[in-house]
């Protein structure tokens, strides 16, 4: 198989994890007889420094021409003082919208080898934590109208709107049901229907979809209760589907109960097979250039790309199994280090995973 991958190296420590990820992809390509072509695309702080824009059209075009996009992480203190439209994170929003990616999928799973690192009580962890958050990605308050104006008394007032159309809810809701059907057949829709009209519209659309999936156990939960249940009883969840902002917050919360944000990949998909694959963590500017950042989440994101965009399940399994074997051997990066284990840096973890493929 021959595939073209757009590579966004990202900012701060991000190029370090992307470098290790490409080493792993090259190893997989060599072992299984594939060819992966890489095209560098600038976004975020790198693009701001080069072009004065977090995502110029010519860089977006590179991503649109590729079979999928691999991203490290963008942002950092250097660009924090810029206006909102010029910040690195705005490039990511444009990329998602430009690629038509409306479904972000983030697993929350505790690797058995890292269970002691979870902040949850051992008896809660022992019940098993393995759920997926399906987050609507290009609607809601992040893409609604934003306004700041001055009232008659001179006080400033800001307004952000949370628009959703039925078709936007239906397509992400259907992904939620289809994903649950392939897993343990349980779906929880998270909203705030006791307050928000958009959430009540979500419920009406989800109720219509529910009739098409009688084999999926469907429930609804307010977002504040869900935030509590994720730390109180996470084993109850299989698939959670929710709107953009709620999903952003809940998936970050869920990442912390796993013990290390450096182990969690994500995928963003639309109607076709092309997707955007990235770790959920940030660019870690405080440790940039020190060869200590954990590359595993980015490497596992590449495994998701092989599985979901390229249909290469065996190759994806090879990467995931290699990571598991490395953890079995007690090899850790600093973020999930524990007594009796061997601490390695970013390149050392890359070496260890390569050795197991």
State where each predicted segment sits:
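Glycine-rich phosphate/nucleotide-binding loop
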Residues: 45-48, 231-331
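Extreme N-terminal starter segment of soluble prokaryotic enzymes
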Residues: 1-5
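Generic secondary-structure signature for well-ordered alpha-helical cores
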Residues: 26, 30-34, 65-68, 97-104, ...
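N-terminal glycine-rich phosphate/adenylate-binding segment common to multiple enzyme folds
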Residues: 49-159, 245-247
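N-terminal beta-loop-helix "entrance" segment that forms/cooperates
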Residues: 33-57, 228-230
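Glycine-rich phosphate/pyrophosphate-binding loop and the adjoining helix
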Residues: 138-139, 143-183, 187-188, 193-195, ...
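Buried hydrophobic positions in well-ordered alpha/beta secondary-structure cores of metabolic enzymes
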Residues: 11-14, 67, 134, 176, ...
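Glycine-rich phosphate/diphosphate-binding loop of Rossmann-like nucleotide-binding domains
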Residues: 6-23, 28-29, 153-224, 236
């Amino acid at each position: 198989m021959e595939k073209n991958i757009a590579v966004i190296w990202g900012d701060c420590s991000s190029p370090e994890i992307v470098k290790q990820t490409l080493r792993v992809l090259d190893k997989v390509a060599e072992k299984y007889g594939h060819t992966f072509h890489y095209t560098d695309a600038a976004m975020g702080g790198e693009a701001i420094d080069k072009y004065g824009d977090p995502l110029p059209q010519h860089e977006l075009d590179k991503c649109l021409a590729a079979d999928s996009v691999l991203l490290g992480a963008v942002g950092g203190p250097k660009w924090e003082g810029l206006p909102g439209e010029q910040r690195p994170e705005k490039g990511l929003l444009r990329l998602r919208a430009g690629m038509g990616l409306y479904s972000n999928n983030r697993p929350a799973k505790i690797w058995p080898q890292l269970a002691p690192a979870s902040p949850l009580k051992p008896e809660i962890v022992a019940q098993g934590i393995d759920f997926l958050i399906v987050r609507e990605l290009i609607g809601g308050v992040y893409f609604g109208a934003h306004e700041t104006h001055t009232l008659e008394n001179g006080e400033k007032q800001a307004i952000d709107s949370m628009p959703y159309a039925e078709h936007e809810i239906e397509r992400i809701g259907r992904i939620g049901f289809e994903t649950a059907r392939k897993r343990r057949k349980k779906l929880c829709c998270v909203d705030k229907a006791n307050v928000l009209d958009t959430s009540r519209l979500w419920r009406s659309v989800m109720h219509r979809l529910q009739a098409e999936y009688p084999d999926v156990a469907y429930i609804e939960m307010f977002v504040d209760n869900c935030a509590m249940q994720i730390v109180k009883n996470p084993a109850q969840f299989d698939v959670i589907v929710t709107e953009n902002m709620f999903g952003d917050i809940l998936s970050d919360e869920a990442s912390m109960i796993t013990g290390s944000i450096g182990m969690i990949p994500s995928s963003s998909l639309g109607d076709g097979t092309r997707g955007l694959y990235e770790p959920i963590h940030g660019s870690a500017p405080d440790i940039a250039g020190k060869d200590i950042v954990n590359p595993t989440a980015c490497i596992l994101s590449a495994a998701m790309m092989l599985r979901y965009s390229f249909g290469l399940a065996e190759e994806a399994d090879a990467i995931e199994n290699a990571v598991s074997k490395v953890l079995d051997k007690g090899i850790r990066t600093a973020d999930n280090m524990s007594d009796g284990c061997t601490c390695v840096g970013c390149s050392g973890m890359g070496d260890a995973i390569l050795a197991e493929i």
